[in-house]
Amino acid sequence: MTKTTKKFETEVQQLLDLVIHSLYSNKDIFLRELISNSSDAIDKVLFEAHQNAAVIEGEPEGKIKLIPDKEAGTITIRDNGVGMTMEEVEKNIGTIAHSGTKAFLANLKEQNVSEHPELIGQFGVGFYASFMVADRVTLVTRRAGQDKAAGVRWESTGDGTYTVEEAVKETRGTEITLHLKEEMKEYLDEWKIRSIVRKYSDYVQYPVVMDVTRTEVPKGVNGEEIEGAGTIEKTVEETLNSMKAIWARAKSEVTEEEYEEFYKHVSHDFEKPLKTIHYSAEGVSEFKALLYLPAHKPFDLFMPERKKGVQLYVRRVFITDSCEQLIPDYLRFVKGVVDSSDLPLNVSREILQEDVQIKRIQKSLVSKIISTLSEMREKEADDYLAFYKEFGQVLKEGVHFDYANREKLQDLLLFESTRTEAGKFTSLKEYVERMPAGQEEIYFITGTSRTALEQSPHLEIFRKKEYEVLFLTDPVDEWVVQGVTEYDGKKLKAVDRGDVIPATEEEKKEQEAKREEAFKQYGDLLSFVKEKLDARVKEVRLSSRLTDSACCLVADEHGLNANMERILRAMNQDVPESKRILELNPDHPLMQVMANLFARDKANPRLGDYCDLLYDQALLTEGSPISDPLRFTRLVAELMVADGKAAAGE
C-alpha cells in the first residue's frame, strides 16, 4: 500500500483545534496521556495472552520507553502493548466512533473549555494532546501476533489531514514520535521528564524507562575507582516510576495528589474527584478497592452504549477495564480499581457473570459506596448536594431496581418542595420531621419543572392547609414512586391522582356534606358536561382540592397522569388509551354562570363551548397540549367580545 493522504472527520478536527488552541494551560499532561495509553495497551496484550500465548512474541514483560532526542528535537514514547491494525488506526485516530459527538461538541462550544477540561477528558482523546507540544506527530504500530510487515505508519501535522501507509515493524506495540515545537524543547530535558513521570505516572504498573548518560570514574575489578584514569560516559536504562499499585498501599502512605493523579489515569477526567474511597475487604471475599466519585457527570452518562464498570485485577494482573458485574447500573458513574485475591487469572466474561465471588464483591462495594454517600449526606452536606445535582437522577434508578438497598437509598434522595426555595432540597426524613399534627401521608407532584408545578391547581388545598408537597421533576421520578410507596410508615401520595384530600375525619365529613349540597345544585350540569366530553373524560365531579381555579384533570389512583404520558411519548412508547377525571370547583363563579345558563336554555350552544374551554383550560394548566388550538383561541376571542359588549352596555 502506498502512502495515502486522508482528511480527519469534521468532529476530530474540531476536537483537535480545541486541544491545540484552548484546552490546557498545563502542557505536561501530554506525556501522562501517552503513558496512560501505553499502559492500557500493555494491559490488553497481557490479557489476550491468557487465551493466545502467541501474541507475547517472546516478550512477556510490559515496558514503556521514553526516548528524547535533542539533536532531532523529538521525544518518542514506545510500548510493547497490543498495537493496532490499519483498520484500528483509522478507527481510533482518524475518526470518532462515539455517538453523541455533535452534542458533545456543542456542549464544548457553549462553555469556557479551559475552565472545564473534564469535558474533553471524558471523551478519551488523550492522544490528541500530543499536538499541544508538537507540530508533527508520527505513529508506527503493529498488532501483536501479526506479521512484521503488517505494521502501520501514521503521520499528521494537525492541519486537518494525515497520511497512512504500511510499514515494517520488528516488535509488537506502538511507537509515537513527537516533533516538538521550538518553544517546547524543554520536554527533552531529562529532569523535566523525570519530574513529569514521578508526578503523573509513578503508579503505572509497568516500568517507564529512559536511557540516561552519566559521567563516572572507571572502576577496577575490585570495584574501586582507578586513580588518574579520568572519566568516561556511561549510558544505562533507568526506570523512572515506582510501579507500586496505589490501591495496594496503606491509605496513610498515599498522598492526596497521588490519589488525584491515579483518578485521572483511570477515568480520563482532568478534574479532581469529588470523593475517594480506598479500602480492603477481608474474610469470605478478599479484595482491595480504590473507587472515586467524579465531580461532574460525563456527557454520555445516559447513553446505552457507554462503557461502564470499574477496572478488575486479579492479584495485580489486569483482567478488564470495564467490569460491569462489579458495579450496578445505577452506580455507573463510579470509577476505580478492584483487585481480587480469590478469582482465577483466566476468568472469562461468562465466569464474571456467574461467579459467586464477583457477587460478593459487588455486594460489598455497593454497601461501601452507599455508606460513603450517607456519611457525606450527614457530615459534608455541600459536597453531597454537589454530587446529587450531578448524579441524583442515576442514583434514583437504584430505588426502583435494587430492592435489597432500597431503604438505604431512600434516605439519599433529595427533592425540592413547596417549603424550600428554588435550588434548595429536602430529604424524606426532613419532610416527615416537619409534618404537622394530623398529616398522615407524604404528598408529591411530578412534572417537568418546579416553575410549572408551582402553578398547578392541584396544590391549592395543600397550600391552604399548609401541607408540604414534594416537587418531583426528573423523568425517573415516575418510576421512583412506584418503588417507594411509603417512608417511615407514611404512604406517598400523588396530589394529582385519585381522591387525595388532606383532611381529618371530621373535615372529611364536612366536605362530603358540602359536596352533597353542591351536587343538588350542579348535578344535572355535571351530567351535561360529562355527556359533552364523554370521548375525552372518564368522569366529571365536584372538587374538594380546588380553592381558586375553575377546574383540573385528575388521574385514577393507579392511572397515567399527564407527566407520565409526556415521558412515554418522549420515549416513543405507546401511550395506553386512558381518560382522566375532570374536577370542577363548585365555589368558582363560572359554575354559577354555567348553572344559570343551563337552567334557562339547555340547548344553548354556548354551553358546549364552555365545556370545551373548561377541558382545554385544564389541559393547559397541567402543561398538556390541546387538540384544537385554533378553535380554542376563536372561542376565547368570542367570549372576550361578548364580555366587552356587555361591559360597554351594548
UniProtKB/Swiss-Prot annotation:
Pfam families: HATPase_c_3, HSP90. InterPro entries: HATPase_C_sf, Heat_shock_protein_90_CS, HSP90_C, Hsp90_fam, Hsp90_N, Ribosomal_Su5_D2-typ_SF. Keywords: ATP-binding, Chaperone, Cytoplasm, Nucleotide-binding, Stress response. Gene3D superfamilies: 3.30.230.80, 3.40.50.11260, Heat shock protein 90, C-terminal domain, Histidine kinase-like ATPase, C-terminal domain. Belongs to the heat shock protein 90 family. NCBIfam families: PRK05218.1. Homodimer. This is Chaperone protein HtpG. The gene is htpG.
